[in-house]
């Protein structure tokens, strides 16, 4: 089916930012009562509504039928207009009471109220509350919630909701109740409840003003011992937010609940955060060092939302980056303060380049403040979150720490208790700093990753260097013509002979398509270090030679720039090898050797610096992606690095064993570098490689060492590989989170038979279609494995298409997140592109597609 020629009469209508209108009715107070049962939950809502404009009361619903509707205690006339319940109200203030019945255990979408592993829990962002109760389900309607939960005490002994617990008691027939009150107005997407048999890790935090906050992390009894790290992270984040942003917690209780089935990573519901269990549970036997970091980051992120998202929320969903971009920036700052800021910056940029840059360069490109959507859940993207954070970071760089803090204080003071816009945030920054951010607003309006070309000329007799910058913002869907965007570029010059910085670092504001900067008093040939610290989310193109990049990888005093020089040297070499098959690998090998030998570098940084770029990122550097050529070049360089430096890798592997099982930063860094060394030893083809990895697996005292060994073995065809995977499954068969690693490691394996393995795993008894974590670990991981997904047979495309269709019937939101890898069809060679496009068309022709998947498919086809 070609959507260019076939009519789309049933296509859902888009929602437009330009059509925003304030709500006609506000709901300052709502009382909810839940009679909880997995098969049949009765919900009663009492809405105090106040007129704010002209028109009837319209309440959103999704799959709901009203059992009764009363206005001011009297049965009322009402009608359904699509999914909206409409009531004509004569006056300006009324009490509307509505009763509905819902079935949580039948809710496989995991939006609204649903059942998960014996619990009842909610997910309401973005539009899940309308699956619970008829309500103006939009973020600019803020209400104070009073909630009563009633349930069977034996089955659901713990009853939690937002705010403060105010009462509880027993009822006849073995039932009980709990009453919760949230004194702070909040939008419906922040409502939450959890009911179940849970154990709690309790602690407390004393705020700067002396208030004692009760903290609770609620999990299954057998998981209680794995919550200590999350609790420590929560208390650390609370103290950090007071110190860095002046934000103090406002309720008397803060609860976190871990659930097994969850579409997102976590949710910042006021006072009752609900988390995917993978971001709560951690101990050395089941969680890698990376998992520990993820738990700390996500706990902090959701806590920080209490101010940047809850106390000040979004006017409409087009403003989503207002809360998410700002909060990601805040959690990045926090994580950088807890460990190595350099390594954290490298990790953040790697994620941006792997997820957001391709999004910005494909059919799903959108600004951080979009102009339209069909299904808002499709805009919980790397652009909104990660690029949004980079836009905030640029403001921080341009204004400076003090002015940025003044701007954030003003923003919170002005808009506390209201629904704000991205414009409100920028205006607060302008007003507090006196800095004109007029042109900077282009970052909110324009999609696409700017490309900046930098050329440095040196006039030796005159002692001058001239830097010429040229910016291009590529066309994206719906935006063919772009303006140049202002950006801060941190720049330094290093002497080629002295190896030292020739001038202090400068922050250059590139605010046009072309710009020249003159440097005086330059006594030797300068080497350009640009976009230091990744000060702007752009692609830099320069005339720096391999020798220049190798020089910077050894001498640049900005850790990110040093890492970036090594990465660019690798990328240039690999791109050359893709084209010629005979690139000179010696400069890369020498640069890696020098980095390994530098005693001044922390092991965690070295581990990042010597890793090859992802194959997918390498493909992004090419006009047309040839996956097989990329794989050949990548394998050649990886093998050469392993073989030529085998003695170095063995030395590193032995030396880094001193890190042991320590969870301190030094031990974690040593484990990371030791794992990288093991990977290169195995890639070298050394006869003892598989045996070395298997020995590490068997002796491992941490999941990090065990997972590293398993990953190294995954690329081999060896008896050791088969034995290790069998042993891993046997050991962790009853731990769903760890078993996700078993699936994911095989799906990501750089092997020619990975498609066979993945198809077999999709039939494995432990593959559960209803669990988003399991789907992401197998299907999602496979789709980003460039060499396996793009198997020339096209089997990878068919597998993903079949999965999207099957999952869409269960969980449309998760299904839609799997479409983008197929949507990049125009970037690949003709044969692959045709197969990918055909698969998109086949899936689009499926009857009964959700609007979530329809939007992704239709945009991907163009």
Describe each region flagged by the PLM.
Residues 354, 381, 520-862:
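Long, ordered, helix-rich scaffold segments
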Residues 99-202, 440, 558-562:
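Extended, low-hydrophobicity, Ser/Thr/Pro/Gly-biased non-transmembrane segments
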Residues 1-42, 114-119, 123, 130, ...:
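N-terminal, polar/Ser/Thr-rich
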